[in-house]
A protein has these predicted regions:
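Bacterial N-terminal signal peptides
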Residues: 8-18
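Bacterial N-terminal signal peptides that target proteins for export
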Residues: 1-9
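Carbohydrate-interacting regions of secretory-pathway proteins
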Residues: 20-191
């Protein structure tokens, strides 16, 4: 089936935004978001993003899909976010190199140094930052998960300086890092 031959297919991208601060006496307690925003929903999914690069992002069956492009490309949210939960359901091929970029500092030039990247890359040469890791920040837990050729759910929480990546209900990375506090979110397609 052609739908499943793509590098990455994202069927749902929801963003939970925190509306208030928590009690400072419990700094590690992370509340549930107060509001959820669906960024990919039916035929209006691409309207919430700017394109960086030339991947052929298309809307298909209430999802967003990319199958080709020259080099890495991103869909970048038009808004910036500081504290949030991202929930993404996706299908990726086993050779995919993709990721969810967060708190990006320059929405026109996306890098894994100027954003936090929750990786989707089963075949990464250095597996410490493979699928489930936060590149350059938090190595993936062992054993490293694989996501190729099946449906997966990524849930990423950014609250204050804390970043938690959960893949298919397993925590794969958990780190405190205060370098990046706010910015757009990007979805990557890489050749």
């Amino acid at each position: 089936d052609k739908v499943f031959s793509s590098r990455i297919l994202i069927i749902l991208f929801s963003l939970g935004v925190y509306g208030c601060a928590t009690d400072s006496s419990e700094p590690m307690a992370i509340p549930e978001p107060t509001d959820w925003v669906t960024l990919i929903d039916g035929t209006e999914g691409l309207d919430n993003f700017n394109r960086v690069g030339d991947a052929n992002w298309t809307e298909e069956f209430s999802s967003i899909r990319a199958t080709e492009g020259n080099g890495a490309s991103w869909l970048v949210t038009k808004d910036s976010y500081s504290d949030f939960v991202i929930r993404v359901e996706f299908w990726a091929s086993d050779d995919s190199n993709s990721g969810i970029y967060m708190r990006c500092q320059n929405p026109e030039v996306i890098t894994d140094r100027d954003c936090y990247e929750a990786n989707i890359y089963d075949q990464r040469p250095d597996p410490s930052y493979g699928t489930g890791g936060i590149v350059h920040r938090a190595a993936v837990s062992e054993p490293a998960p694989t996501v190729g050729d099946k449906w997966n759910v990524y849930r990423i929480t950014a609250y204050g300086d804390r970043l938690i990546a959960e893949l298919n209900n397993e925590i794969t990375a958990d780190v405190s890092d205060s370098e990046l506090s706010e910015g757009p979110i990007g979805l990557q397609w890489a050749a």
